[in-house]
């Protein structure tokens, strides 16, 4: 039997344009029910991979709790390092982008995971088992910390895609290269890695960065 898993990165409005000190709104919460209803109509159970500002939105918490109670969705965790407390200043490169969590010292990575995990417990009463890294970036330390905090499934690998052109914040820090990772489910440091399905296409339907354009591929969530 083959399984069809739908995962949704669930985060604040226009998060990629956010600058430190600006408010991150979550108006998109009011539209999530439409997609949930569509999934439920066809018997699909989506995984809402949710980041810091979303799990602090009372309407979102109510939406998730209602649908989890009906067994129509699953809650997952999604961590964007730049707006997930505690805040820690990294050096900034000349052509830098948003920071990857794996750029931070281990103790800061752990502190950020502690913050969002404890908030999950506070808001929902439990820690979800599924996770996706912000900006897809994983390394050995990240896998080890996820296991330590009770997460058991990751879906950050994008087989066939390199993010080396997607810079982090610190000087010359490039994203991960997943061109050679397996498309099959595998165990990594106790975590079950379920790679994202990647479909080759002739055109892009996203506002792509350079690495997406060079690969000419679309990631299906």
Where are these regions (language model features)?
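Active-site beta->alpha N-cap acidic-glycine motif
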Residues: 1-71
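A solvent-exposed, charged loop/short amphipathic helix patch at secondary-structure junctions
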Residues: 19-20, 92-101, 212-221
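Hydrophobic faces of well-ordered beta-strands that scaffold small-molecule active sites
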Residues: 4-8, 46-48, 75-79, 129-131, ...
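Short acidic/His/Gly/Ser-rich catalytic and metal-binding motifs that mark active-site loops
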Residues: 12-17, 84-90, 204
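A structural signal for the main folded, soluble domain(s) of proteins
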Residues: 25-27, 34, 38, 67-75, ...
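Metal-dependent polysaccharide deacetylase catalytic core of the NodB/CE4 family, i.e.
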Residues: 52-137, 198-200
């Amino acid at each position: 039997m083959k399984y069809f898993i739908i995962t949704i990165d669930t985060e604040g409005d226009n998060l990629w344009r956010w600058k430190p000190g600006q408010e991150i709104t979550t108006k998109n919460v009011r539209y999530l029910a439409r997609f949930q209803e569509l999934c439920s109509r066809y018997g699909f159970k989506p995984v809402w991979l949710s980041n810091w500002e979303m799990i602090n939105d009372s309407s979102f918490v109510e939406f998730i709790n209602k649908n989890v109670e009906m067994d129509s969705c699953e809650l997952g965790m999604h961590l964007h390092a730049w707006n997930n407390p505690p805040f820690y200043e990294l050096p900034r490169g000349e052509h830098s982008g948003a920071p990857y969590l794996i750029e931070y010292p281990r103790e800061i990575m752990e502190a950020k995971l502690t913050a969002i995990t404890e908030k999950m417990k506070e808001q929902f009463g439990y820690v979800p088992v599924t996770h996706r890294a912000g900006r897809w970036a994983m390394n050995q330390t990240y896998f080890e910390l996820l296991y330590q905090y009770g997460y058991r499934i990751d879906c950050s690998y994008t087989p066939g895609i390199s993010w080396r052109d997607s810079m982090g914040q610190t000087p010359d820090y490039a994203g991960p290269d997943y061109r050679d990772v397996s498309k099959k489910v595998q165990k990594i440091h106790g975590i079950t890695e379920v790679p994202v399905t990647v479909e080759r296409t002739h055109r892009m339907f996203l506002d792509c960065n350079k690495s997406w354009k060079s690969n000419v591929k679309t990631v299906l969530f």
